Every structure is written in C-alpha cells, then in structure tokens.
Amino acid sequence: MNHRDRARGCLLGLAAGDALGAPAENMTPEQIIARWGRLTEIEGGGTDDTEYAIFAASLLLRHGHALTPADVAAAYRSEIIPLMTGPMRGAGFSELGTVQALRRGLEPPLTGRVHAHGWSDGLAMRAAPYGIFCPGDPAEAARLVEQDGLVSGDGEGILGGRAVAGAVAAAMAGARPREVADAALAVIPADSWTARAIVRAREVLGDISGTAGQSTAGQGTAGQSTAGDGIPGDLGRRLHEAVVVRHYPWTDVAPEAVALALAAFLAGEGDVEASVTFGVGLGRDADTIGAIAGAMSGAFQGEAGVPRRWAERIGPATGKCLPVVKGRHVLDVADELAKGR
C-alpha cells in the first residue's frame, strides 16, 4: 500500500465519519439506539470537521514544514474572515472565538487564549492532514499541528490535536492499532488530561493487558455489544464512565473526543466501518469522534478500506462553514498532500 492510497483512505475516512456522525451529534448512546438502532448509512453531508481539514491541508501545501502560527493567522484574515457575510455556520466555539480575536487585532498565541474554549476538539478534528504530511514521524506531525493550534486553541485543545496528528502519522507508515495509540501518547505529556483519558480508555478495552483487538471486536456477550455490531452497549457505557465529563454542558471536549475516537479505532481493530460505526454510536461530539476514528482507520487500511457506499456519498465540500474550501473534494486534497510532502 503506497502513501497516496493511505492519504486517500485517511481523508475519505475522515469525511465519511464526519457525515455519518453528524445526525448523532450531542446525543447519548441510548438516544442513538432508540432512533436508529445502529448508525450505518450516511444521510447527509459533512460538517466543519471536513472543511477545516481541507483548509489545514491548504496551509501545509503552501508552507510545508516551515508553517508558523503567523502563517495560519494570515490565512484566517485573508481567506476566512473576508468571506464571512453572515454567521459562521457549524463552526466550533474555539474557531468562532479565534475569528473574533483576530478581528480585534490580536495575534497568536493570544488568539487561542483569549476565548474560553481552548480545550475544544477543533484542532483534533482537522489534525489528520498533518499526519498524512509526516508519515512515520509522529513528532514532526505533532509539531506542525501545534503551529496551527496556537492560533485557535490552548492547553488540552492543542494536546488533542498533537495526539491525533501523531496517531495518523504512525498509521500512515503502517503501524498496527496499538502502535498507533502508543504514538498518540508519545507526543503529549503523560500527566496531561488527554493522555490520562486515552490510558483510561485503553484500560477499559483491556488493551493495556494485551486483550484489545483480540476479544473486543465482534465477540459481544449478552448485554455487551462490541465494535463488530457497531453498537457500543456496555463497553460504550464503561468508556463514557472512564472519560466523559458528564456535568459539562458542551460535548466538544478534546480529551474525551480523542480518547473515544482512539477507543473506537482499537475496538474496531483498525477496520474503517467497524471503527467509525462504533465511534459515532458513542454519541457526544459524534461527528468529530467519527471523523478522527475514520482518519486513523482510513490511513491504516487505505482507500479500499472505506466502504464503497460511504465513498459514493462523499462529494465536494459545500463551503457551508468555510466558503474558501467550497468545491474541494477530499480525494483531490489527499492526492495533493501525497505529492507535496
């Protein structure tokens, strides 16, 4: 499997996970089961996750390894803000706060600190292109995504992006699922909220003792559905207990979204459909969890790993959130990243 194939699988998996999870955003697993039973079919288009990933890729194609926060801020000012003729539909809190800060004349890193949402998963959702750009080099992928993150996030929000970029970089080089999770942990502090959430999720799966990927996928017992049937069941409940901040009203919390996405990837043994359906079935920020799980598993399995029926539902970006990316298709973007690294 070559780099282009993995790049296409990564961004196609991201877009599919985003679109599949969009209707379930902010729902609980119980609500999802009551409405769909199991979410397996894409009903509509993607969200800001896909559009921001395309925008992040454009930054890499323009600046490569020399990317700086100043470059990212300049792109916001020249490509995003001038085209905002109304509300920034579907954008996350951190990105909305960043636009407001830039309009006030602030510069990074203050643009990511002045608002109250630096911990959001806005960077994690768009981190995959950095992993594509740095196959086999999680540390460099994490360094690059942080340059982007300093404009819109802070603290755990940046660490969540680093973890995803590192994981995708490892998957792009053919690392096995457990090694992908190890790569995510290797590029963030062990005592961070994000790292602790990932470790707790792995413990729930039994991955620390080496049982995840052997007994969790498709071998559910009564009352305990697993990744094989796409319904989290008791495993999902235990993952929620381990990492979800139940008392907080918003669901776009980077440490929990990243940990749940990695858990879905591990439970699905890197299979795109198993990982994504399990991830979106966890609810919460379901589109972002699905997008991250799809990016990791797509990088691991390549383009052929993305179900054909999903791939056929992914069209050019609508530009609903970011008009600058309207008409861009993730497969074209993936090809450009594969050539431009």
Language model feature labels by segment:
Residues 1-341:
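Structured, active/binding-site neighborhoods that engage oxygen-rich ligands
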